[in-house]
Amino acid sequence: MTLVVHVGPARAQWWKEHLQGLLPELDVRLWDEPYDVADVRQAVVWKPPAGGLKRFPNLEVIVSMGAGIDHVLVDPELPRHLPLIRTTGFDLTQRMREYVCLHVLRLHRRLPEIEAAQGRREWLQLVNPPAYERKVGVMGLGNLGADCARSLSMLGFDVAGWARRDHDIEGVECFAGNDRFDEFLARTEILVCLLPLTEATRGILDASLFARLPKGACIINVARGEHLVERDLLDALASGQIRAAALDVFHDEPLPHDHPFWDHPDVLVTPHVASLIDPVSGGKAIADNIRRFMRGEPVPDLVDIERGY
């Protein structure tokens, strides 16, 4: 029984050896290695090539090497009848929590302006409201979003969350559905996007959304680059409708060298590292989910392909 792995070349051999050690009962092969496609039962993938998964006639399960599954669903020839499992866990949640809290605090305390003043050798003292007067909004209340919202509330921020369906999170005012979206946006000074990427959320961070935020609001996008209409953000920054942005994900990755975000004084660019999967803990989570699936046990990270999350 063969498990095939598709991942970037930098860590491919490590992943193969680590998963083989965790799953000795399986024959782990890299995507481009020789093997009999009829023997493949499991595929562990990150950004697999279009049409690649359909070539395994006996494939039983697909595992995403991360919490996001859009990189799998984008395949027009995806065998959509197969179970799809994402990879989550404490490690990924902790990393996302750290990143989001860091950048909410950075924007709340106006550190970009202080850093710019340092470059001018200017002693700039800014008075900020206390955290309990700063309204933070988290879009997307899945495992990562709910944890970040809860953590921001524990830091003292006035936190709201928005999702398609109702949630109940201690310390967080929860909004649900399109009919309460404008109300959520109107009270949000720092907006964190942690939505899954679906056809309904693609391009959601656009001029229309920015206009419904308070003037001078800030944006943090740690979901997917396709959530953001980049030109609309640049225009909103130029007009002052948006004060600053921290972006970890982009439509094109790596971000092209000539992209205006690189040099923009009000945009912080990070290279998709907010919740980068750690091979040790991530490998264990993947192996645990595969074993649960093979034993016919419930898999908590099983996703609904039609919903997209």
Question: Predicted regions span which residues?
Answer:
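N-terminal glycine-/charge-rich "phosphate-binding" loop or analogous flexible N-terminal tail
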Residues: 1-41
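C-terminal helix-to-coil terminal segments
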Residues: 85-99, 107, 113-114, 253-309
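Glycine-rich NAD(P)-binding loop of Rossmann-like domains
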Residues: 114-147, 174
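Short acidic low-complexity segments
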Residues: 28-39, 50-53, 172-187
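Phosphate/diphosphate ligand-binding glycine-rich loop within oxidoreductases
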Residues: 41-115
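Glycine-rich, N-terminal phosphate-binding loop of Rossmann-like dinucleotide-binding domains
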Residues: 47, 66, 193-195, 222-223, ...
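Phosphate-coordination loops involved in phosphoryl transfer and adenosine-cofactor binding
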Residues: 81, 132-135, 216
